C-alpha cells in the first residue's frame, strides 16, 4: 500500500511537467503557431434530407457532407491545416465548423516561419464550395452553378488583408454566411501576440455571432 502511494506521489510532478513542456513549444524564436476557424451557415431551398454525417480532412483543407449538402474548404497559401470538423443541422440549414487544435495537443501542428506568416497575411485564400448532393432533375432546381452575390460583405478589423474568402455555391443554396478567423495559438502565452485576422461573407443581413453560438457535433 505504501509503495503504491509513493509511486503515485512521484508521478504527479512529472505529469504537471509534461503539460508545461508541451506549451514550451511557444518559446520558439524561429516559428509561429497559427490556428484557424472557419464557420459556414448554408440555407437550402427545401428541408434537409436525413443523412449520415461524413467528413474528410486532407492537407490544407477539409470537407463535410450532411443533409444533402457538401461543404468543402481549401486553404490556399495559408500554411494551415484543420484538425476537427463539426456540424449542426436545423430544418433547412446546415452549420459547419472547421478548426485547428492547439500545437501542444495534436500532431502535425500548424507551424510556420516568419516569411510564411508574411505570405499568409498577403495571399491566404479560404476557398469555400457548396455542392448539392440531391437529384438535379427535381422540380425545385434553380440556376445551376450560379455564384451567390453578397448583399453585405464585411472585413472585420484588425485584418488588413482584404477578402480572404472565395465562395461558390450550387443551385440548391438560398443563402450562405461564412466567417474566417486566423489567430495566434500562443497568444495567451507569449508576451506579444500576432493580431487576429478575420473575414466575413454573407448573402443576408446578419452577424458572425449567430453562427458562433451554434452547438456543433463532431463529424
UniProtKB/Swiss-Prot annotation:
| Signal peptide (from-to) | 1-16
Subcellular location field: Secreted
Keywords, comma-separated and alphabetical: Early protein, Glycoprotein, Host-virus interaction, Inhibition of host chemokines by virus, Secreted, Signal, Viral immunoevasion
What does the entry say induces or represses the expression of this protein?
Expressed in the early phase of the viral replicative cycle.
The main place the protein resides is: secreted
Residues with attached carbohydrate:
70
Cellular component, GO, one term: extracellular region
Q: Kindly name one Pfam family recorded for this protein.
A: Orthopox_35kD
Q: Report the protein's function.
A: May interact with several cellular chemokines to interfere with chemokine-glycosaminoglycan (GAG) interactions at the cell surface to alter chemotaxis of nearby responsive cells.
Q: Which family does it belong to?
A: Belongs to the orthopoxvirus OPG170 family.
Q: Please give the name of this protein.
A: Protein OPG170
Q: Which organism's genome codes for this protein? A: Vaccinia virus (strain Copenhagen) (VACV)
Amino acid at each position: 500500500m505504501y509503495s503504491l502511494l509513493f509511486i503515485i506521489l512521484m508521478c504527479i510532478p512529472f505529469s504537471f511537467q509534461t503539460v508545461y513542456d508541451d506549451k514550451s513549444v511557444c518559446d520558439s524564436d524561429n516559428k509561429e503557431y497559427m490556428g484557424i476557424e472557419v464557420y459556414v451557415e448554408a440555407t437550402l431551398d427545401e428541408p434537409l434530407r436525413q443523412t449520415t454525417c461524413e467528413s474528410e480532412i486532407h492537407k490544407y483543407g477539409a470537407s463535410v457532407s450532411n443533409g444533402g449538402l457538401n461543404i468543402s474548404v481549401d486553404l490556399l497559401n495559408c500554411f494551415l491545416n484543420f484538425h476537427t470538423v463539426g456540424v449542426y443541422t436545423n430544418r433547412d440549414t446546415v452549420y459547419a465548423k472547421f478548426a485547428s487544435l492547439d500545437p501542444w495537443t495534436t500532431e502535425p501542428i500548424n507551424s510556420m516561419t516568419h516569411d510564411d506568416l508574411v505570405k499568409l497575411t498577403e495571399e491566404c485564400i479560404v476557398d469555400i464550395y457548396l455542392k448539392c448532393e440531391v437529384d438535379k432533375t427535381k422540380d425545385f432546381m434553380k440556376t445551376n452553378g450560379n455564384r451567390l452575390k453578397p448583399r453585405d460583405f464585411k472585413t472585420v478589423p484588425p485584418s488588413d488583408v482584404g477578402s480572404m474568402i472565395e465562395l461558390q455555391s450550387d443551385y440548391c443554396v438560398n443563402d450562405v454566411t461564412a466567417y474566417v478567423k486566423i489567430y495566434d495559438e500562443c497568444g495567451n502565452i507569449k508576451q506579444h501576440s500576432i493580431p487576429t485576422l478575420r473575414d466575413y461573407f454573407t448573402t443576408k443581413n446578419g452577424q458572425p455571432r449567430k453562427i458562433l453560438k451554434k452547438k456543433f457535433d463532431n463529424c
